[in-house]
Structure formats: C-alpha cells, structure tokens
C-alpha cells in the first residue's frame, strides 16, 4: 500500500535534503503558481483543476515537511552514528568482515554514482513525465504507435487501443485548460534547461533552445499550435 524512507542510509538522507526534495518542491511550486494564476480568474478552471492542484500540492507539502523534519531531528548525523556503530561491530570479528565488510562502502559508492544524476532524474520525472499534461497524454499513445509501426500490425489490438485511447482522451479534455498547460510546458522546459547539467540534457532540448533563441514561450507556442494532443 505504500513505501517508506525510514531505512535510508546517511547518503540517501543527504541526497534527499540537498538535491531530490528541493528539486521536487521547486518544480511543483512553479506548477502550482501557474495554476493559481488561472484558477483565481475563472470558476470553471478552478473546478477543472481542483483535483490536479490538490494532487500536486499534497506531495509539495509532504517534501517541504520531510526536509524540515530531517533537518530538525538531525537525521543525517543520527544515521552516520548508526553506520559507525555498524562498522565498528563488523570490524570486531573476521567473519563479520568477510560477510559485511563491503556493505557500507558499496552503498556509499552507489550513492556517489546516483548523486551525479539525481537532479536530472528528478527533473525528468517532475518537469517531464509529470510536468506538462500534453506529454503524459502523448506518452499514452506509444503502445498504439509501436503496434502501427510493426510490419504486420494486429488490427484487433489496434481497435481495442483506439477505443481505450478515445475514452481516455474524452476524459482528459473534459478537465483540460490549454493556457495552463502551455505556460507549464514553457516553464518546465526553461527550468530543465537552466538547472540540469549540460551533459545530462536531452539533445532535442539543446536544438530547441538554439532554434527558438532561448525563448521558451515561442517554443511552447510552436508545439501547442502544431500538436494533435492539444
């Protein structure tokens, strides 16, 4: 039914405090601000986006609170102390060294590798997959696109996919306000471009930055005026 971060190592706690949580909060704050600006001016939009706003806001508040709690309770130092005790216990016995001697170094090295990509991964998830609604809708058509690309597509399968996607699209556009999504797209792409390391950005983003001379509003306008998903 759920998951927990209770058993994170000190390196995991450090990454949450310094990288992952701040990124989630920053990105979601931007999404909420964009929604707020439109919802305050229209009861219809406010009703359309009430559930979406609450969904984004819930985890925004969660990660703000988690970060405050981790700092206030000094969780990082407590984790370090536990790991030091574990390390000392291991080093008291040759058999333990053989069984567990590499445990903490392996975890530490794994986090050293993960931490290099943690910010980019969070932006990919929060500003990409969970960012503009247009991207999630387009992604739901991948299965149909893959089937149609086959040498001999399964027509029965295609028919079922089309029916399912039509129902999904009808529900999607019922609570969709294009100006919010257009502004969100521009903002998310801008944040991704500014905050993620150059060597971890997708090639297409660099091409779009060059094509639209760094104007993400123009980039968003071009996408939304041409896309079949808007």
Predicted regions and their residues:
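Terminal presequence/propeptide segments associated with secretion/organelle targeting
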Residues: 1-230
């Amino acid at each position: 039914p759920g998951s927990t971060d209770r058993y994170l190592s000190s390196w995991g706690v450090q990454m949450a405090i310094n990288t992952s949580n701040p990124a989630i909060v920053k990105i979601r704050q931007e999404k909420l601000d964009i929604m707020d600006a439109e919802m305050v001016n229209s009861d219809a939009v406010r009703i359309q986006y009430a559930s979406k706003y609450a969904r984004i806001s819930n985890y925004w508040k969660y990660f703000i609170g988690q970060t405050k709690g981790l700092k206030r309770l000094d969780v990082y130092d407590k984790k370090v102390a536990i790991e030091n005790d574990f390390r000392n216990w291991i080093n008291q016995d040759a058999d333990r060294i053989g069984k567990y001697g590499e445990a903490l170094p392996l975890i530490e090295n794994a986090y050293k590798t993960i931490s290099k990509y943690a910010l980019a991964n969070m932006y990919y998830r929060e500003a990409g997959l969970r960012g503009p609604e247009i991207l999630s809708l387009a992604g739901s058509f991948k299965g149909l696109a893959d089937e149609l690309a086959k040498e001999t597509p399964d027509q029965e399968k295609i028919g079922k996919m089309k029916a399912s996607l039509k129902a999904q699209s009808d529900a999607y556009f019922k609570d969709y306000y294009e100006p919010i999504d257009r502004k969100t797209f521009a903002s998310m792409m801008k944040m991704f471009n500014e905050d993620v390391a150059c060597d971890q950005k997708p090639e297409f983003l660099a091409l779009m930055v060059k094509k639209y001379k760094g104007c993400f509003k123009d980039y968003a306008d071009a996408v939304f005026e041409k896309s079949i998903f808007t």
